[in-house]
Amino acid sequence: MKHRTAPMVRHPLAAALCVATILPGVALAQTPRERALEARIAELERQVYLLVSAQQQQQSQIAQTQTQVSEVRSLQAQAPAAPVVPAGKKPIQLSSITPNALPGTTFRFGGFIKADFMTTRTSDGALPEGAVGRYLYIPTQTPVGGQASSTDTDFHAKFSRFNLGVDTVTENGDKLTGFIELDFFGNALASQVNNLYGGTLRHAYMSWNNWLAGQTWSNFIDATILPEAADIVGPTDGALFSRQTQIRYTRGAFSVSAENPEILTTPYQGGNTLLASDHGVMPDLTARYNWKGTWGTFGLSAIARQYRTRSALTNDTDFGGAIAGGGRWIINSSNDLRYQLSYGEGLGRYLGLGNGSDVELDVDGNIHTVTTVAGWVAWRHDYSARLRSTIMYSRVDYDHALANTGALASASQQSLRTNIFYSPLPKVDVGAELMYGRREAENGDSGDISRLQFTTKYSF
């Protein structure tokens, strides 16, 4: 009997190949459970990779932030210290908002919105349409001569103003200041259609430590003592009131300046006519000294001037000057007294808004200075923190030569006014003022002016 195992023995290579072919198929035949486990492992590996990447990115961002913080702290250490702010108050501005400004520069903006409502009566003639005297008290414009009386009503907002200021303290401690202020006193299309008012430059100056250059209040005057009034000046007749371009040096309470040498001239037989000229070579030179204490303030000032004329008849030169004193006396917490007195040869341009002439011309065109005495006094009383009133009297006298000026030149001007102001809110003022003024000419003719004025003002 024959066996069938021989062929398998004879072909071992074929058997091995058969087994090798079958086994991989068995190994690849995974169950669904095994495939699910492998998928979960792959997902876990992906999440671990994402976490590691996020951590590396976060560490990079932290490093960048630390670098930026270090740079900011370095810049802050180099910048000047911020001003100390009182407890409970936040600073309005921490850094400059002016382009290319020096470090430590601050910017300020201010002003007020003022509206005036007034009715004016003149006894001897009318104030012309558009005359400056229709909007504020100009003593030289008070009509005289016996013409019919006139009454006018005017509303305007000409004296609203705004200002810009820049202040800097350098690394060396030098103080730099720039200041500019405008109102709308110009008369461009004053009451036509839209009541457009032209801008008027009040202040435009810069200061460096003790030096000042530009246009501002004359060093000869002290504007801080002027009383509160609905009128933009108040005691206009006898008050020193002038802003002009100058160079000033201040050291403590003492100051000196060289200022614009404009003069006001009454031509021969010109009556009340005032002509402006600037033929002078020498600037107006002033000196001032101020005292202040718990009692109030007081100041003395002096001015030296040169007067020159040019005409077909002659060129003449003369010199003059003036002195002034004034201040504020604090009587008590509810009352104060303000005052000023001035005397000089050629003082007219510095009084009020150019109240009178500095010089007059004779028949040959020669200069003669006009002797002038002026002053005012004002008493203020506070009824409460919100309600107050002021009464004031002002006067100026001129010593003209009738042979030079003629009979219509002003011999004197005076006014009396009283007002009351109420502040319903901080920075808001409403007030009413009654004024009576009188101008007398050299020939004895006179004219009166009365004005009732209401005003509102919001300061910012």
Identify the residue ranges that each predicted region occupies.
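N-terminal periplasmic/intermembrane-space "pro-region" immediately following the signal or transit peptide
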Residues: 28-128
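C-terminal closing repeat unit and adjoining cap/tail of repeat-based domains
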Residues: 416-433
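Gram-negative bacterial Sec-dependent N-terminal signal peptides
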Residues: 2-28
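Outer-membrane beta-barrel "beta-signal"
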Residues: 422-424, 448-460
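Sequence/structural signature of outer-membrane beta-barrel proteins
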Residues: 120, 185-189, 218-233, 259-272, ...
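Outer membrane beta-barrel
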Residues: 94-131, 139-265, 281-282, 286-292, ...
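Detector for outer-membrane/organellar transmembrane beta-barrel domains
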Residues: 292-410
